[in-house]
Swiss-Prot record:
It catalyses: adenosine 5'-phosphosulfate + ATP = 3'-phosphoadenylyl sulfate + ADP + H(+). It comes from the Bacteria. Residues 1-20 are annotated as: Disordered. This is Adenylyl-sulfate kinase. The active site is at residue 121. Pathway: Sulfur metabolism; hydrogen sulfide biosynthesis; sulfite from sulfate: step 2/3. ATP binds at residues 47-54.
Length: 213
């Protein structure tokens, strides 16, 4: 796989292969945003397994869709059925998983969509990597801050039980580190009611003029 680098001026990911060139399009992101009636952004939900990332991202997508906002939800489990099905859970594979998702999210932002992503994404460097792919203001980090004890009590997929029994290695929060965001754009307390958290998210999006109502 050829190495890639980010162009600071237009946020294009460029290949080091001189035979591969970037083809600009006549229709711009701004044109698409005008047609959609809102900005294209990424809301990056991060937190432990069982923290409520997928639940909140799904509920927010429903709320936005009902308001006429063009959205797409990228879920950590779903992308491993196709886009990232060849990857495991080593540090290198986890980084590549997030890199691929970041590139897809960037394309969707260029299409003028509000992109919601639900990934543990345990390392700050990985989240920063995605942020650096996007223009200023296009990446909104949402930290779903739910205590480990609550996540483990929920354990919707039985993964904590397997990790505690030694049947699942490198599980974030048990034998693999989770690096909490130092200064997330949105800090949610995951024990609160989903309806309350969705209102908090909508308030931020309205305050940033990403959505109108």
């Amino acid at each position: 796989m050829p190495a890639h680098q980010l162009d600071d001026h237009n946020q294009e990911t460029r290949s080091d292969d001189e035979n591969i060139v970037w083809h600009p399009h006549a229709i711009t992101r701004q044109d698409r945003e005008q047609q959609h009636g809102h900005q294209g952004v990424v809301l990056w939900f991060t937190g432990l397994s069982g923290s409520g990332k997928s639940t909140l991202a799904g509920a927010l997508e429903q709320a936005l869709f009902a308001r006429g906002v063009s959205t797409y939800l990228l879920d950590g489990d779903n992308v491993r059925h196709g886009l990232c099905r060849d990857l495991g859970f080593s540090d290198a594979d986890r980084r590549e998983n997030i890199r691929r998702v970041g590139e897809v999210a960037k394309l969707m932002v260029d299409a003028g969509l509000v992109v919601l992503t639900a990934f543990i994404s345990p390392h700050r460097a990985e989240r920063k990597m995605v942020q650096d792919m996007l223009a200023s203001g296009q990446f909104i980090e949402v930290f779903v801050d739910t205590p480990l004890a609550i996540c483990e009590a929920r354990d919707p997929k039985g993964l904590y039980k397997k990790a505690r029994a030694g049947e699942l290695k490198n599980f974030t929060g048990i034998d693999s580190v989770y690096e909490s965001p130092a200064s997330p754009d949105i800090h949610l307390q995951g024990e609160q009611l989903v309806t309350n958290l969705i209102e908090q998210l909508l308030d931020v999006l309205r305050g940033r003029a990403i959505i109108k109502s």
